[in-house]
Amino acid sequence: MTTGDCCHLPGSLCDCSSSPAFSKVVEATGLGPPQYVAQVTSRDGRLLSTVIRALDTPSDCPFCRICHEGANGENLLSPCGCTGTLGAVHKSCLEKWLSSSNTSYCELCHTEFAVEKRPRPLTEWLKDPGPRTEKRTLCCDMVCFVFITPLAAISGWLCLRGAQDHLRLHSRLEAVGLIALTIALFTIYVLWTLVSFRYHCQLYSEWRKTNQKVRLKIREADGSEDPHHSLLATGLLKKVAEETPV
């Protein structure tokens, strides 16, 4: 959707009915009355979501600012300082958002949430380590480790057996050469293993820090009559009614 010259202030609702592009959109969709268009952005200017509400429906129920759904099966909460139509959010939606963005605060009002972060298991990283290059590197190193380990062991054993045979035949030069070859072979193998292991441990450590399961420490009231949800709905409807132009 083209919003024309709308203001992009976090937490604000912009009246874009005067914009020609917006008028065309309203005519095409058949919505009739003008609408509020709220562009939700963070401080760095990145667009987070777009909220569209009709002006003549101040009695609409509050909706989640992330999934834009109402309180169907899950209560709406107001865990931060955002007000109006941006103040309601599902707990599960907010937890997914905080987990994907790797933050613990609201990107609009910068309120810190009380959260509990749990690292994801190693099996999830093995299935999806991140970008395609890292996934390819991990697969190649694992395949090389599986094939090179027995190959290095067999080669070292054969070199040592050959060195013993040459020592029995008093061929010390050949024996020393085979022993040196065995030492060089195992040195290269150990160094490659340590470097690869350290590299992937570093990638896993970074992935573990940025991919955590976030759980909000918020108590939700049980039952169909939720007093917190009722107060939240009343406040949101009052805010929408105040912002509706006459």
Curated annotation (Swiss-Prot):
EC number: 2.3.2.27
UniProt enzyme class: transferase
Family annotation (InterPro entries): Znf_RING, Znf_RING-CH, Znf_RING/FYVE/PHD
Membrane topology: Multi-pass membrane protein
Region (Required for interaction with IKBKG): 121-246
Origin: domain of life: Eukaryota
Residues that hold Zn(2+) 1 according to the record: 64, 67, 90, 93
Substrates-to-products reaction catalysed: S-ubiquitinyl-[E2 ubiquitin-conjugating enzyme]-L-cysteine + [acceptor protein]-L-lysine = [E2 ubiquitin-conjugating enzyme]-L-cysteine + N(6)-ubiquitinyl-[acceptor protein]-L-lysine
Pathway note: Protein modification; protein ubiquitination
Summary of subunit composition and partner proteins: Interacts with STX6; the interaction promotes MARCHF2-mediated ubiquitination and degradation of CFTR. Interacts with MARCHF3. Interacts with GOPC/CAL; the interaction leads to CFTR ubiquitination and degradation. Interacts with CFTR; the interaction leads to CFTR ubiqtuitination and degradation. Interacts (via PDZ domain) with DLG1 (via PDZ domains); the interaction leads to DLG1 ubiqtuitination and degradation. Interacts with ERGIC3. Interacts with ADRB2.
Protein name: E3 ubiquitin-protein ligase MARCHF2
Organism: Rattus norvegicus (Rat)
